């Protein structure tokens, strides 16, 4: 005799917003992997010389690649925002025996993200 297994709908997670957000965050790892691969391809093309880099730029101008990168960017932002949102729950920081407010932890993470983004933009654009 086997245990009773209650049937579960295929898209059970789409009914509640919190479950949907969780599933979208989990799916975002695919797009994070795409960006890592894309950046490695950029580095390889730059290292191989001007012709290789031009071929990569032509590949990147393909409308399918542009749409994929826009979708990937939106998922990457979702991934980053939800990652930072979990930080105050994962990091219990105490100063003088009192817990640091969640907003302060979030502000620190977003400030660090902004500083790193400005530095990277400065390095790339200058």
UniProtKB/Swiss-Prot annotation:
Is the keyword DNA-binding in the record? Answer: no
Q: Does the keyword Transmembrane apply?
A: yes
Alphabetized UniProt keyword annotations: Cell membrane, Membrane, Transmembrane, Transmembrane helix
Subunit notes for this chain?
Part of an enzyme complex containing four subunits: a flavoprotein (FrdA), an iron-sulfur protein (FrdB), and two hydrophobic anchor proteins (FrdC and FrdD).
Record-linked InterPro entries:
Fumarate_red_C, SQR/QFR_C/D
Q: Which family does it belong to?
A: Belongs to the FrdC family.
The leader peptide range reads none
Residues spanning the membrane? 30-50, 64-84, 105-125
* GO molecular-function terms, A-Z: succinate dehydrogenase activity
Q: How does it sit in the membrane?
A: Multi-pass membrane protein
**Locations listed in the record:** Cell membrane
Q: What does this protein do?
A: Anchors the catalytic components of the fumarate reductase complex to the cell membrane, binds quinones.
- Please give the organism: Mycobacterium tuberculosis (strain ATCC 25177 / H37Ra)
Q: What GO cellular component entries does it have? A: fumarate reductase complex; plasma membrane
The entry's protein name is Fumarate reductase subunit C
């Amino acid at each position: 005799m086997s245990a009773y297994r209650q049937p579960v709908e295929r898209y059970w997670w789409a009914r509640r917003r919190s479950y949907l957000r969780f599933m979208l965050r989990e799916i975002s790892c695919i797009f994070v992997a795409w960006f890592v691969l894309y950046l490695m391809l950029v580095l390889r093309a730059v290292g191989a010389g001007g012709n290789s880099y031009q071929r990569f730029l032509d590949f990147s101008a393909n409308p399918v690649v542009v749409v994929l990168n826009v979708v990937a960017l939106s998922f990457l932002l979702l991934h980053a925002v939800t990652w930072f949102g979990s930080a105050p729950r994962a990091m219990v920081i105490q100063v003088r025996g009192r817990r640091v407010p969640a907003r302060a932890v979030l502000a620190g993470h977003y400030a660090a993200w902004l500083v790193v983004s400005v530095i990277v933009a400065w390095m790339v654009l200058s």
